[in-house]
Regions:
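Generic protein-terminus/edge-of-domain signal
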Residues: 1-68
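Single conserved hydrophobic/aromatic residue that forms the stacking wall/gate
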Residues: 249-257
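Short beta-strand His + acidic residue motifs that chelate non-heme Fe in jelly-roll/DSBH
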Residues: 59-61, 83-90
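Basic/polar phosphate-binding segments, predominantly the helix-turn-helix DNA-binding elements
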Residues: 213-250
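A hydrophobic/aromatic-rich effector-binding and dimerization subdomain
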Residues: 88-152
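Short hydrophobic clusters on alpha-helical segments that form packing/core surfaces
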Residues: 195, 199-203, 234, 238, ...
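An amphipathic alpha-helical interaction segment
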Residues: 137-200
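Conserved metal-binding segment of the jelly-roll/cupin
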Residues: 69-83, 100
Length: 257
């Protein structure tokens, strides 16, 4: 593992790092203002994590890129992603909320079967969700409802009820991301125009004959976006997938000849 990255395998280990009680071995809702003050560090989690930050906390390092992490930002991470801030020796008090849950929690549930539909877990931090005040209140309400269930003694209903409430939170995130795609239409149109120019350049030579259609991953990389965010944005803006637009692009010169 790369030097300077701290791997946190499970929910108990994360709770221990923050100095909070573990109410359930597979899931935790944390009021970060009540966590221990801590130094900046880069992490890899062995579980899903959703962070709502309520203070501006400077440059956040995701992978090898720096992003300005603003107040009221929601970031969703899948297991295995690298995130954090490089240690500069400072100690800070985090503020906001965190929901962390292990894949084992949702295995065999509706959420476990549909978790791949929540493609924002693979978005990059610069593609994070920026919440309105009303949206923030709804997200915090979901956190509190999950925590309320965690404070109940674990019984045969616990897993299903917790998973249902997490699924509701993720469905709200889907709705809010769709709103964000709409309200950022000017930015999205610019990305779409850049994508069209990228296709023009790709098909202008013989690269398509040598390599076939450009992959979504390649196109996203050229546009400095994650594949999932790029694919979702193109679908929302055009009603078609990036691959479908590539196929249409192939036929256009033919129609013009």
């Amino acid at each position: 593992m790369e030097k300077g990255i701290h791997y946190i395998e499970n929910v108990f280990e994360y709770n221990d790092l923050l100095g909070v009680e573990t109410l359930h071995p597979l899931v935790s809702v944390i009021d970060l203002s009540k966590a221990h003050p801590m130094k900046h560090v880069r992490h890899i989690f062995g579980f899903y994590a959703i962070f709502l930050k309520e203070v501006k906390c400077g440059d956040l390092l995701y992978g090898r890129q720096h992003y300005d992490y603003q107040e009221g930002t929601l970031v969703c991470l899948a297991p295995g992603q690298v995130i954090g801030i490089e240690d500069n020796g400072e100690v800070y008090q985090p503020k906001g909320w965190a929901l962390v849950f292990h894949p084992d929690l949702v295995r065999g549930t509706s959420l476990g079967r549909n978790i791949r539909e929540y493609s924002f877990f693979s978005y990059e931090v610069n593609e994070a969700l920026h919440l309105s005040e009303r949206e923030r209140e709804m997200v915090v309400g979901c956190f509190l409802k999950i925590r309320q269930e965690l404070e109940h003694a674990i019984d045969r209903h616990s897993k299903r009820l917790i998973a249902i409430n997490i699924e509701m939170l993720l469905d709200y995130c889907l709705r809010f991301y769709e709103r964000q795609f709409i309200t950022r239409s000017n930015v999205n149109h610019d990305i779409l125009a850049r994508f069209e120019r990228l296709l023009d350049d790709y098909f202008a030579g013989d690269r398509a004959q040598r390599e076939g259609l450009p992959s979504v991953k390649w196109c996203a990389g050229e546009l400095c976006l994650s594949p999932n965010y790029f694919g979702d944005l193109i679908k929302k803006e055009t009603g078609k997938s990036a691959q479908e637009l590539s196929l249409i692009h192939i036929s256009e010169p033919t129609r013009q000849e």
